[in-house]
Amino acid sequence: MNKLRLVLIAALMIITAANGSRTSVAQEQPSKRLPLGAVKPALDMRSLEGSAAPTWQDLRGKVVIMDFWATWCTPCIESIPHLNGLKKELADQPVSLLSITYEPGAKVREFLKTHKMETDIFIDNDLSTFKSFSSWGIPITYVFDGEGRLVAGVSPKNLTAEIVRKILAGETPLLKEHGGWDDPAGAAKYFREQLEEDRKKFGSN
């Protein structure tokens, strides 16, 4: 009887350890996207001109729209006219619209010679902001209300001025949420490889 008990205990310990190992591995994997209600991640990035990013305190009271993009991303490029229009339509509202890429500033400036962007452009050149926002399935646009609560994570073309005005009024409109990227670890690896290649060609800034 004692031997049977020892065997059962040993088996239970092995199963528990295996489950714990799987949990640990899962926790290390990047998530598909930032969940609604998440704690505001740090804004570890700089403007295209090299100045520091605004803090959440600076942005308090505003609806903050953060669009994650890249110059090689076709859907991102297709979304630029829509975001430009959104910026213009909401110009008289307490709204900040930030476009965030991880690419070197020199590459972005080259891109802007042929693509007009009205949004405020920021560079996350170590991918820390992409990581903290789980922004691997680009383009993805996060919307924070005036209290800094994440109220939407959508494809940019699904965000309209009418929706933003509802958020300004304190409403939480129902939106088709961006599902994130099915392989965030693979996307993160690809972004890092792209960044290294870009640095060889354009430098770090």
Segments (PLM) and residue ranges:
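Conserved redox-active cysteine motifs that mediate thiol-disulfide chemistry
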Residues: 68-85
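C-terminal segment of classical bacterial N-terminal signal peptides
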Residues: 14-23
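N-terminal "domain-start" segment that seeds a small globular fold
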Residues: 24-56
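Thiol/disulfide oxidoreductase modules built on the thioredoxin-like
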Residues: 111-118, 124-168
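Thiol-/selenol-based redox modules, centered on thioredoxin-like
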Residues: 146-205
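Thiol-based oxidoreductase modules, predominantly thioredoxin-like and allied folds used
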Residues: 93-107, 117-127
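Short pre-active-site segment immediately N-terminal to redox-active cysteine/selenocysteine motifs
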Residues: 62-64, 68-72, 104, 137
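Bacterial N-terminal signal peptides that target proteins for export
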Residues: 1-8
